[in-house]
UniProtKB/Swiss-Prot annotation:
Binds 2 heme b groups non-covalently. It comes from Archocentrus centrarchus. Belongs to the cytochrome b family. The lineage of its organism: Eukaryota, Metazoa, Chordata, Craniata, Vertebrata. The gene is mt-cyb. It is a multi-pass membrane protein. This is Cytochrome b.
Length: 79
């Protein structure tokens, strides 16, 4: 869904809102693709947070190198 949305989205500050409106109104099933993308991204981050919670529960934070790699991956995912 991200590639399809990127084909129609403009990141310019003057036209960003109108490009989102264009996706929702003029693109066939654009509203559905936008909602699927938003819900999929939210579910992805919920899974990441559950994985972090599992690591906290089982004490994986004691493995400093592994935990630091995970933190870096989380920050890269959020960029």
């Amino acid at each position: 869904t991200a590639l399809f949305l990127a084909m129609h989205y403009t990141s310019d500050i003057a036209t960003a809102f109108s490009s989102v409106a264009h996706i929702c109104r003029d693109v066939n099933y654009g509203w559905l693709i936008r909602n699927m993308h938003a819900n999929g991204a939210s579910f992805f981050f919920i899974c990441i947070y559950l994985h972090i919670g599992r690591g906290l529960y089982y004490g994986s934070y004691l493995y400093k190198e592994t935990w630091n790699v995970g933190v870096v991956l989380l920050l890269l995912t959020m960029m």
